[in-house]
Swiss-Prot record:
One of its GO terms (molecular function) is ion channel inhibitor activity. Residues 20-45 form a propeptide. This is Conotoxin LeD51. GO terms for cellular component: extracellular region. It comes from Conus litteratus (Lettered cone). Belongs to the conotoxin O2 superfamily. The presence of a 'disulfide through disulfide knot' structurally defines this protein as a knottin. The lineage of its organism: Eukaryota, Metazoa, Spiralia, Lophotrochozoa, Mollusca. Its main location: secreted. Keywords: Disulfide bond, Knottin, Neurotoxin, Secreted, Signal, Toxin.
Length: 76
């Protein structure tokens, strides 16, 4: 009878530990999703912010990241 009681206690501890680990995993997944969404938003803005990258049509040098506009933004 004592062995059965000990076995049940060990099983209960293992199950509660597993439940805690699973909950922690869910929180980590949510944190990872938030982190990746922030990175995606930064990538959508472009490497240098709101300026245009190379070979993009422009009207003024201030539109280009390089500050060099000759109908298209130049890299340098």
């Amino acid at each position: 009878m004592e062995k059965l009681t000990i076995l049940l206690l060990v099983a209960a501890v293992l199950m509660s530990t597993q439940a805690l680990v699973e909950r922690a995993g869910e929180n980590r997944s949510k944190e990872n999703i938030k982190f990746l969404l922030k990175r995606k938003r930064a990538a959508d803005r472009g490497m240098w912010g709101k300026c245009k990258d190379g070979l993009t049509t422009c009207l003024a040098p201030s539109e280009c990241c390089s500050g060099n506009c000759e109908q298209n933004c130049k890299m340098w």
